[in-house]
Amino acid sequence: MRLVQLSRHSIAFPSPEGALREPNGLLALGGDLSPARLLMAYQHGIFPWFSPGDPILWWSPDPRAVLWPEKFHLSRSMKRFHNASPYRVTLNYAFDRVIDGCANHRDEGTWITRGIEEAYRRLHELGHAHSIEVWRDQELVGGMYGVSQGALFCGESMFSRQENASKTALLVFCAEFTRHGGKLIDCQVINSHTASLGAIEIPRRDYLDHLAALRQQPLASRFWVPRTLFLPRK
């Protein structure tokens, strides 16, 4: 296994099976963040992740963190909060503000560089990247964004400025995504937050098999049209 230097003149990637074991999943470096290359990456289970000042790094970790949306873990406290929630949730209303919120909400710094923001804005303009917004009155208090691959959604980042705002974004999105034919959410790398919401780890080979099948399955017509999302209260 060796780290591959990508060419700016080809958008091809090496097989994810050749990724390094340490650091886990590092596959390649270089290239660019053009829409064509980003889409090629997601179609093959690869994503960019690098710090400011570093070269572009491409990853495909093993195991892979995923969330089956119908298995979202709704804790008792979150259920009580949601039933009396002051929030309103929308889809694709404010992509620029969501990615900006994700980039600027971490005190310890962020991997979402200006180049990353611009690249995913282009993907959004092309209909491939999407945002979920959480509002309190007219204030954006949380949200998440990611890239669609048919019935699979590749979650990229989320942020929260008020209590349970990012959890609300994922909860409502999971319900709506499932109702319209969505099958799986890619969480990339497991962490305590996503694990508490139901994310699990599966072998990379299994993830790649799911991706190959699900990216061919379309969601219900016009699913990504900007609109308000609702979840029945129980």
Swiss-Prot record:
<dbReference type="InterPro" id="IPR016181">
    <property type="entry name" value="Acyl_CoA_acyltransferase"/>
</dbReference>
<protein>
    <recommendedName>
        <fullName>Leucyl/phenylalanyl-tRNA--protein transferase</fullName>
        <ecNumber>2.3.2.6</ecNumber>
    </recommendedName>
</protein>
<keyword id="KW-0012">Acyltransferase</keyword>
<comment type="function">
    <text>Functions in the N-end rule pathway of protein degradation where it conjugates Leu, Phe and, less efficiently, Met from aminoacyl-tRNAs to the N-termini of proteins containing an N-terminal arginine or lysine.</text>
</comment>
<dbReference type="Pfam" id="PF03588">
    <property type="entry name" value="Leu_Phe_trans"/>
</dbReference>
<dbReference type="GO" id="GO:0008914">
    <property type="term" value="F:leucyl-tRNA--protein transferase activity"/>
</dbReference>
<keyword id="KW-0808">Transferase</keyword>
<comment type="similarity">
    <text>Belongs to the L/F-transferase family.</text>
</comment>
<dbReference type="InterPro" id="IPR042221">
    <property type="entry name" value="Leu/Phe-tRNA_Trfase_N"/>
</dbReference>
<dbReference type="InterPro" id="IPR042203">
    <property type="entry name" value="Leu/Phe-tRNA_Trfase_C"/>
</dbReference>
<keyword id="KW-0963">Cytoplasm</keyword>
<dbReference type="GO" id="GO:0030163">
    <property type="term" value="P:protein catabolic process"/>
</dbReference>
<dbReference type="GO" id="GO:0005737">
    <property type="term" value="C:cytoplasm"/>
</dbReference>
<dbReference type="InterPro" id="IPR004616">
    <property type="entry name" value="Leu/Phe-tRNA_Trfase"/>
</dbReference>
